[in-house]
Amino acid sequence: MLENKKKFCVVFAGGGTGGHIYPGIAVADELQSLAKSHNVEIEIHWIGSSSGMDRSIVEKSLVSCGGSITAFHGIACGKLRRYFSFRNFTDLFKIFFGFISSYFLLKKLKPNCLFSKGGFVSVTPCRACKLLKIPYFTHECDFTPGLATRLNSGGAKKILVSYEETSGYFKESLRSKICVTGNPVRPVFYEDNSSAGREFLGIPETNSKPILLVLGGSLGALQINNLVVENLDYLKKNFIVIHQTGKKFADENPKIMESGDEFYKPYAFIYSQMPSVIQAADIVLSRSGANSLWECAVTSKPMILVPLCSNGSRGDQVDNAKYFKDKNAAFMLVGEDATSDKLIECLESLKDKTKREQFSDSLKIICGKEKPVSRIAGIVLEEMQ
């Protein structure tokens, strides 16, 4: 006689950027995989923003998640900004309607638990969970907790963080609920696809010149793009440069995009090939958003980090970069240090294979042996049962 499967329902909440979505989908995939091995059936729903870019990013991601998620549910989503804006007042109405939508959706779905991956869209579902007495987990990907995590942490069953030191940023009364998990990364980043990356880039295996991957993000990073353009002669002489510029920079600088050759390969954006391209790289020059940072870290790639530190940022990228710098796992260029001379100094150091190996060894220690996605999925499944 076949044993009846236990059936659970889990709701995921998060959005705003791919950094809140892709890691969550990785957890959803792993949770489904783990459930099968435990003879458990899980129905997963995702709550995200109903409007603008947020919805399109989430829905595009859900299409490629392998069927792990049953449905996407859009809610109104406001935002509390760190500066004065009239929209702070109008967004209060969005937050209210987002809460009402979350409350009735969760009451209908009756989930066993909710997993919050962050972004302000996760706040109202977590508040509704608290009212409905639905247990929820919240995960913080950055070194310092963001506003959404701080708001969600009080009622959370478990607070999952990427770094042990992050615990110190929470109230002492909450620290017993904290679990250090690392930041979840899609499994494809753990696979050795460097040959596929070289093939995509048109770089033969016989070419021994170090590959420098420059990540400006999907929207681009003007500071990083300018550093590359200003030092292109030096870079091409010493490296094969793979430059993801972002669409805006590509549209505004067609001559640069057309100037590609065997030593300089500009791309507006690299899509599904990104995991294999990172694996093919020897050095990465990048911002220090949590998602891209950990994608490079789990592949043990030496990094030069140029964190975003404008007035519109809470400084999370600086904190992330400083952590890796202090662990001897990356160079950091911030403020007055983000100059051509400093960049070249860092690159000259990383031309030494021994130095690159030192950074790689430090990254392996940071990331640990257990995959964060497995640790998180295990915690969620264990708490449900």
Where are the regions that the model predicts?
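Active-site-proximal region of nucleotide-activated glycan assembly enzymes
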Residues: K6, H38-E43, G67-T70, K130-S195, ...
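An amphipathic, basic-hydrophobic alpha-helix
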Residues: R81-C113, L131
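Conserved nucleotide-sugar phosphate-binding/catalytic loop shared by glycosyltransferases and other
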Residues: K7-G15, H38-K94, T181-N183, E336
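A short, well-ordered alpha-helix in the C-terminal region of glycosyltransferases
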Residues: K355-K369
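Donor-nucleotide binding loops and adjacent catalytic segments primarily
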Residues: Q32, V40, I47, I57-L62, ...
